[in-house]
Amino acid sequence: MYCTLRFPLPLHIPQTRTMTSCQPKRRRVEHLRCSAQPSSIREDDEDADDRRVGVERRISIVVERYGNGTSKRYFLDDDDSPLQGILEERETKPDNNSQSSNSSETNILWLPDVVRDFVFPSGFPGSVSDDYLDYMLWQFPTNITGWICNVLVTSSLLKAVGVGSFSGTSAAATAAASAAAIRWVSKDGIGALGRLLIGGRFGSLFDDDPKQWRMYADFIGSAGSFFDLATQLYPSQFLLLASTGNLAKAVARGLRDPSFRVIQNHFAISGNLGEVAAKEEVWEVAAQLIGLGFGILIIDTPGLVKSFPFVLLTWTSIRLVHLWLRYQSLAVLQFNTVNLKRARIIVESHVVHSVVPGYVDCNKRENILLWQRFMKPRIIFGVSLEELSGLEKSVSKVKALLKMYTKEKYILTLNKLNKDTEFSVSFKVNATSRDVLRCLWQAYWLEENMEESFKDKDSVFHWLKQSLSEMDNKFDDFLFKLDTAGWNLRESNLKVPNQVLIDQESIPF
């Protein structure tokens, strides 16, 4: 027995943002002849299920999301083809933040991404309080009016000390004083560009390693002081040398102030940050008065001011002592929070000796001057899928890595560079500081236990699987010893790079 069934096709068309059709829509009617016997219908259903499963297996999609809101969609349907992605424009999605935060975000949507990232903290508006934007919008014109007054005051001060007093007429004297004020303020303005650059471009660095950046601030400030010192030799190049020196000192100030605020916050364990800052001013002003007194005694020494080599030698000697004292003052700081440098120390100690050092010992072993990028083993965080796939852009390698790290919030792979091993880490959406610790533990275990050389991709994957197994067995012990050693696990300076994140929810297996 047969019957005729009429189905309007297509039954379902998934609509995507990237696929459109220029053909006019037609309603097709498909006539199918089917048997009324249940067994035949089941066979047709099974065939349809097989085709549907085949499509799902064939079309695997991975979404790579970027910090500026854009994303790239990868189709992993052909193991033999190179990895390719489709870049998608930014989509504005509503979130669950407060109404004030949503209003703040709406007010800045017209700003280009580069300007937004330069002006506002990372994660704005969710990373700051709701009144942040309103305060800054009022603070900005306040600072403008303050600097206008500063220019007028500078001009008056220069007139008072006699600048332009020998120019003849009153009009000429006024013009000379104004020109001198413009040159002096221009010097300050050029220097202010350094603070603008540091605050906008490197603002996210200070919370992680305030010791290092406070030390670098003194190095750069020393270079700026040297340019100021050189104006005595080349007075005709005063504006160039003074502006360069002021620029360097402004960069140093841009590094110094945020770093020291982090250090002050570390001191204020009772929530008394304002009092700690005020008492620090007492220490600083007292030191300033003593230093000014000794400085006046030195320059008042007969014959010293006229001898530039002696001035240079004296300045160099005192500056070296100053840098040594600065290093010693930073070396005694004892942070009980985990940053990337300290995380490397405690992870290596646990992998090699099964011991986690306390924060006092770890801070003593921390290298203040060394950048993380120069530490061994070399670990590159926040890489893209294309970088993970290697030079060959292998789809099969990416699929194997995604499957291996299904339970993790990151993907770690490695490359052999001569005698050194380089690790690359890509984080997934919703990764936390705990995942940063896990990838560090895995990298150090591989560095310690992996054989000197490996021949092919299969051996690399073998070691990766082995390291994941070891980490599953020992990471809980690491966290327990970290807690018992006195480390603050509630607060962490291990930040997940948000420039590139993998959306695991779009990965079908």
Curated annotation (Swiss-Prot):
It comes from Arabidopsis thaliana. Pfam families: UVB_sens_C, UVB_sens_prot. Residues 22-49 are annotated as: Disordered. The gene is RUS5. This is Protein root UVB sensitive 5. Belongs to the RUS1 family.
